Each structure stands twice: as structure tokens, then as C-alpha cells.
């Protein structure tokens, strides 16, 4: 799930409502926790959710996929692939299993952003034999993501 200012605003509002936080200190704490998830103009940020409906299957898969978040990459057509920066707030994996939730940051150079804005493809993938995948982002989705670079 790619994050932007609006999705983070909704998450903050939801947490304030659910936790019945109305005081300024509590609101400031929620803002401090969630604001780092907003793209800063040179990156995209996403929440990776690894979901399995069956609890036992989820346990097996999270163990099988230990550290998979370190194999995720982004690539702008014509440029080298770049590893994502995962879980800056705290380590969510260990040698035995990965977490079901990861926070990812994808950094882009000015040249890469310009290439995306002028038609180059955007690719995301996982460079790991346990789950090899590469996806070229649909043009309409890419256009939405480009708004985070302004």
C-alpha cells in the first residue's frame, strides 16, 4: 500500500478516534509516529502487508520469508535497480521469521524522477529465489505515484 499525505491523515484520524485521543500531547505523539511515512518529494513510501487467511499457513510463510523485505527493489527503466530501505523505525525481522507488516522507503534521484515524468517505466520487484517477482507499474498508477515527487 503506497502512502501519501492523505492516507496518513486518514490513519492518524482513525487512531485518534479509536484511542479517543483529544489532548494536544496525544495528538502530537500520533503525528510524530505517522508523519515519517509521508513521502518527502524524492521518495515513495509504502506499507508492505504479508497476509495469509489461515493462521498456521501464515506462521509457516513468515518463517519461510525471513528477511524478504531486504530483497525488495525499485527500478526506473534505463537505471540500475535500487534496494528498498525497510523498517527504519525498528527491526521487524529476525533469523527465524519476518514480520507481517513492513514500512518501506524507495529513494529516487532527480534524473530518475525526470525519466519517470517523461515516460520511463517504473518497476518493483523482489530479488529472492523464495519469491522472485518483477512488476511494471501500470501507467495510471505511476501517474498517481508521480504526485508524490512534487
Q: Could you describe each region identified by the protein language model?
A:
Residues 1-43, 51-150:
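Long, contiguous binding/interaction regions
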